Each structure stands twice: as structure tokens, then as C-alpha cells.
């Protein structure tokens, strides 16, 4: 791993409140910590498109807002992010377009 990659990883771990666990085995992390780590890994991947299924389920309000802010930032920087969620607060916090899936056809809002 390059120094630049290590710096990016450190930054993401710090941003998501996980730096103190950098040497911990994932099984030692709580569910919310694992969830934040998975999102940090997805962001770190550098992929142009991220597909996130219920990315904030089980997270407290503070961490949900942290994730929402980072997703907005990633989108502003040109990343396409598809979020599948039932969380209205997350939708209102970071989504530009919404498609509701139900029994009737929906339109993009």
C-alpha cells in the first residue's frame, strides 16, 4: 500500500471514529462499528458507483448524519451513489432523487 493510500485510510478511520480500532480484528467491533467500517471501505475503493443497502440501519443519529454528510460529499465529487433504505431521515439528508418501490409504479421525485 502506498503512503498516499495509508493516509487516505487513516483519514477515513478517523472520520468515522474507528482509528482507535485500526489493529482490532473485525469480530471485535460492534455492529455499528462494522457498518461504518464497511462504508469507509466502499469509499476507500475509489469506485465511481457505490450501491449501499440500508447503510445506516442500526446506527445512532449522530453516526447516521456523519454517513449522510460523507455520502453528499462523495456525490458532490462526482460519485454516483445508489442508496436502498427505509430510513426517511437518511433520504431527506442526502438523496437528490428518490424512487419509491411499492405495489404501484413510481416516478423519480
Predicted regions, residues:
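Conserved ABC ATPase signature
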Residues: 25-29
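H-loop/switch region of ABC-family ATPase nucleotide-binding domains
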Residues: 85-86
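ABC-family nucleotide-binding domains
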Residues: 60
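Hydrophobic anchor residue at the start of the ABC signature
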Residues: 39
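Catalytic Walker B motif of ABC-type/P-loop ATPase nucleotide-binding domains
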Residues: 50-53
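Short loop immediately C-terminal to the Walker-B catalytic DE motif
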Residues: 56-57
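Conserved ABC ATPase "signature" region
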Residues: 4-21
